[in-house]
């Protein structure tokens, strides 16, 4: 994790000139609109679980209150937007380790990348692990040695990333349940289903207090 913190800071500290990357204007509004649309597919489903729907609605309501009317990117940098453990090629040391897969890179805030990488909805997908608060703090402390960040913005991005993970899985669960011709292996379907199990939703709800 120390190497990952260093690599992320190195990417975020990389100078950039004129480019064709999208500049994220109001990322929270964009993320909310996307999540609301995905959630709508599950919530409108006649086979939707009432308790699951209740969690999703609560998460949406909380995030709605967190969307700023006006928002400006404080310290813009190149961000990956889809970071998970699979994006890191770790060598013997930090100097021969790399971050890969940059299909959806944009100009945004480092806090968005940090939150996506550390969110429970990200770590659980690849590793079945949900990081403890102490582990998140330790990672951020290491990152802060190389680049400063705004903790409040990080926390807000963290909540929105949790919403995105849950709503995407709820949408995918309905789609694959209704169409047995869609290609998906059993392991992936079970993982998607686990995101809308009450035990997982209760753990994630801790971020929406």
Enumerate the language-model features and the residues they cover:
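Hydrophobic core segments within long, regular secondary-structure runs in both alpha-
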Residues: 57-61, 133-140, 189-201
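ATP/Mg2+ or Mg2+-diphosphate-binding catalytic cores
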Residues: 167-209
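All-alpha amphipathic helical-bundle segments outside canonical DNA-binding/catalytic cores
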Residues: 23-26, 148-161
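Active-site acidic catalytic loop and adjacent metal/ATP-binding pocket
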Residues: 11, 64-112
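Short proline/glycine- and basic residue-enriched helix-capping loop/turn segments at helix->loop/beta transitions
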Residues: 30, 58-65
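A cross-family kinase active-site recognition segment
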Residues: 1-55, 74-76, 106-107, 186-187
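Active-site activation/catalytic loop segments of kinase-like enzymes and analogous catalytic loops
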Residues: 111-148, 161-179
């Amino acid at each position: 994790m120390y190497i990952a913190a260093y690599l992320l800071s190195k990417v975020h500290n990389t100078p950039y000139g004129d480019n064709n990357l999208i500049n994220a204007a109001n990322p929270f509004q964009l993320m909310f609109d996307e999540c609301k649309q995905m959630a709508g597919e599950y919530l409108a489903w006649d086979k939707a679980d009432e308790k699951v729907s209740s969690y999703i609605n609560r998460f949406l309501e909380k995030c709605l209150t967190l969307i700023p009317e006006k928002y400006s990117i404080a310290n813009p940098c190149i961000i990956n937007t889809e970071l998970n453990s699979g994006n890191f090629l770790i060598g013997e040391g930090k100097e021969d380790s790399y971050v890969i897969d940059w299909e959806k890179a944009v100009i945004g805030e480092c806090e968005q990348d940090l939150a996506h990488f550390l969110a429970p909805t990200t770590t659980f997908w690849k590793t079945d692990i949900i990081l403890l608060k102490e582990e998140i703090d330790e990672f951020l402390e290491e990152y802060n040695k190389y680049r400063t960040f705004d903790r409040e913005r990080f926390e807000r991005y963290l909540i929105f990333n949790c919403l995105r993970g849950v709503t995407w899985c709820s949408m995918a669960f309905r789609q694959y349940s209704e169409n047995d011709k869609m290609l998906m292996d059993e392991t992936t379907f079970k993982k998607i289903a686990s995101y809308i199990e009450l035990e997982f939703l209760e753990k994630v709800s801790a971020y929406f207090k």
